[in-house]
Amino acid sequence: MRRITLLLLSIFLAWGAMASVTDVKIIYKVEVDGWTSANPNTHFGGITLTCNDVAKSVNLTPRNLDANEMNIDLSGNVSISFTRKYRGFDFVGFSIGKTDLGQAPTLTAKQKKQMKKGTPLVAKFKTDGSKDVTLFYDDDPKAYRIPAIATTGTGRIVAVSDYRHSLDDIGRDVHRTGSMRIDLVARTSDDNGATWSQPQTIAQGDDNQVGSYLRAFGDATMAAYGTNILVMAAAGDVIYPGGTAENPNRMARIYSTDNGQTWQIEEMTRKVYVEANSLIPDGVSSFFGSGKLAVDPDFNGTGKARVYGAVLIKNAERTDNNYVVYSDDLGANWNILGGSQTPVAFASEPKVDILPNGQILLSARRQGGRTFNIFTYTDKATNSGIWDSAVNGCENGGKNGTDGEVLCIDAWKADRTPVKLLLQSQPKGGASHYDRRDVTIWYKEVSTDTNYTSTDIANGWTQGKQLSTQESSYSAMCLQQDGNVAFFFEEAPCYGDDYTKGYCMVYLCLSVEEITEGKYSQR
């Protein structure tokens, strides 16, 4: 395998304007077996050097190929440790000269003397052979969050993330950055996730647009069909809990009709809620549940695509309710599914998908699991139908209230019987709202011949593949052209290890066999 000697980069901690009188100049390098510039993963890991209880951390990337010099105190006990793992690489250990030091050495006097004379300290890595790709690295004081993903009719995968100059949700600046700007950035793949484009900003926030929907764009949800791509996003500078009829949080439509080459943006706030003639007139705050919109490419045999979205609405009484809305014109206009019926009350960020029999599934975030409800059409020609009663379920999710995704896919049983599988992703975590870790997919069989109740959907889930063993949170998924599942989610590490700010945004290509751990196969 090719070995490339690379340099440690990105010193995260401020080390002071002047070096200590006991500091000496040393050289750091990193060696990575199997890495080439064609590899989309560009962060290898992080290490920490500790001397006299003073820790200095560096992040390892291929951005600088020349040797770096660093001033550090070697007068006391010096220990070195591997402290930051990224997808795509395994840490091997440290070395000085021809001496391997292991993975967590304390330097001897001889080794410190070698370093003082210019012998490099080398951190060694190797590629792990996986196809996992980190699309956005959170190693900058501007944070990435909130995954959204869709596949167009040409097979192009489009992955979108918040790029948070504010380090926070829309309408907040608790970290005192002086900014409320959030951009939406995208990367695309035309070969089922093997390679990816460079990042593209599809909606750029502007701090000069105070009070306008143009100040920030975030919490995107996506749909695609043909060469059309629709993104619905929260917008502006009013945080969701603070919205009022006079000053609601904003909503934006961002769309492309040329497979993502160009994008248009328009405000949708008062089309969806607030106004007397809007979709939900008593709403004072709203946004679409992030991740994936559901698409029926040929609704009721009309030849037209119908897009379904799940929205969270805070009404004038400050109650949070979930609704499903639909659009037959790429999000330009929306209608509410089920009229005045409220599918889910007192819940949070919702997701939607279409069951094999045409029923519409609403899956909402709540503390302690998920809340499910089912809409059944009685007459598609008139868009008539009825919602079941909402049912809470916890077999398929973590104990904390965190966003997850729902998706229906094709599969084979072991006896080659064709089936449909319903997938639900969620962190397992723990009881705390912020104990977000161990993102996992649950699954269950669903049939084209069965009309389901909410209780049917809430029960009978099987835990599938656990995708992360560390801090991990929101997730989205869609079907790729090759039949695999494109899974896009938030995972450690993040800048400053503060997960209230951001995460790395990781893409995984998952087969049915992987998701179900061999119990079903792909068809």
Residue ranges with predicted function:
Residues 7-16:
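Bacterial N-terminal signal peptides
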Residues 128-523:
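Asp-box/BNR beta-propeller blade signature and adjacent active/binding-site loops
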Residues 22-30, 84, 104-129:
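Conserved "repeat-terminator" motif of extracellular CCP/Sushi domains
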Residues 21-25, 73-79:
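Short coil/turn motif common to extracellular beta-sandwich-like domains
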Residues 75-106:
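Surface-exposed interfaces of beta-sheet-rich extracellular modules
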Residues 34-60:
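Short, ordered, surface-exposed loop/turn motifs in non-cytosolic proteins
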Residues 50-76:
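Tryptophan-paired
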Residues 1-4:
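Positively charged n-region of N-terminal signal peptides that target proteins for export
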